[in-house]
Design a protein with these regions (language model features):
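A short acidic-to-branched-hydrophobic micro-motif
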Residues: 131-138
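Short, solvent-exposed helix-loop connector elements
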Residues: 144-150
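An N-terminally biased module of ancient metal coordination in phosphate/nucleic-acid-related enzymes
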Residues: 213-246
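Accessory alpha-helical DNA-binding modules that contact the DNA backbone or grooves
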Residues: 1-90, 94-123, 127-130, 143-144, ...
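Residue-level marker of alpha-helix boundaries and capping positions
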Residues: 52, 150, 239-242
Length: 246
């Protein structure tokens, strides 16, 4: 690409594919152009932090914050816990008897970051790695906090709706009863149970029908590493191959 067309950027590659200039290169035809344009479109649509990088950053941050005085546990949450291929940011939940103090200590770790939001239960900053959310709650509400920090916006909105149907409120990191008193949910199993739901695995908390499936007793069984017997890789006419799978 560089030797023939002097292409040095993604934008130049897209322009060459759109104008037909790629065909100046041997064995580059219409099919190759289409595949390149499709690949560029997918790449641009998946901006964010790759899951491998996000996982490493989250584990490092959780390890650092988990060593703070008064922090019992530091748990992975957000896109990373849902194993999104590309993560919008990283999230950690701190379990502490004094959550506000835990967040104040965490804030000192981000002295060079822009603070986007700060409350007694959430610290959200923009750093060189992207957006970072640090939640904090008491042990008795760790389950509701982790559920809040893990699910997608659509999933948590559905949980809020179901809570209202149960005469409860799901506000920030806690469940509240009709009087406004907090309802304990020390783990996610108890949190979902209070809403009349079975435990929903983080990987499917996307607001794409998992709530309805849970209510109907039709949650899918997730594939685990023990289920994988091998890896099959092939190129067919569906991509850049010349034969079919048959």
């Amino acid at each position: 690409l560089y030797n023939v067309l002097k292409i040095t950027s993604l934008e130049e590659l897209r322009e060459a594919a759109e104008t037909g200039r790629l065909r100046e290169i041997p064995r580059m035809g219409e099919k190759a152009e289409r595949n390149i344009l499709d690949g560029i479109a997918k790449s641009l649509a998946r901006r964010g932090i790759p899951i491998v990088r996000a996982m490493a950053l989250t584990e490092s941050l959780a390890g650092q914050l988990g060593r703070q005085n008064g922090v019992r546990r530091a748990l992975m949450a957000g896109d990373c816990r849902r194993y999104r291929e590309m993560c919008d940011g990283i999230s950690v939940v701190l379990v502490s008897d004094k959550p506000a103090r835990a967040l104040a200590q965490a804030a000192s770790s981000f002295s060079n970051a822009d603070v986007l939001e700060a409350s007694d239960s959430l610290l959200r900053v923009r750093s060189e790695f992207g957006e970072i959310s640090v939640w904090a709650e008491e042990p008795g509400h760790a389950g509701s906090a982790l559920a809040r920090a893990t699910g997608s916006a659509r999933h948590t909105a559905a949980l809020e709706r179901i809570a209202r149907e149960k005469k409860l409120s799901f506000v920030e990191t806690r469940l509240l009863d009709e009087s406004g008193a907090p309802v304990a949910a020390p783990d996610e199993q108890s949190f979902y149970g209070l809403l009349g739901l079975p435990y929903i695995a983080p990987e499917i908390r996307e607001g794409q029908g998992e709530i309805e499936a849970a209510l109907a007793g039709r949650l899918p069984e997730l594939i685990t590493i023990e289920d994988i017997a091998g890896d099959l890789h092939m190129h067919t006419v569906a991509s850049d191959g010349v034969g079919t799978a048959a």
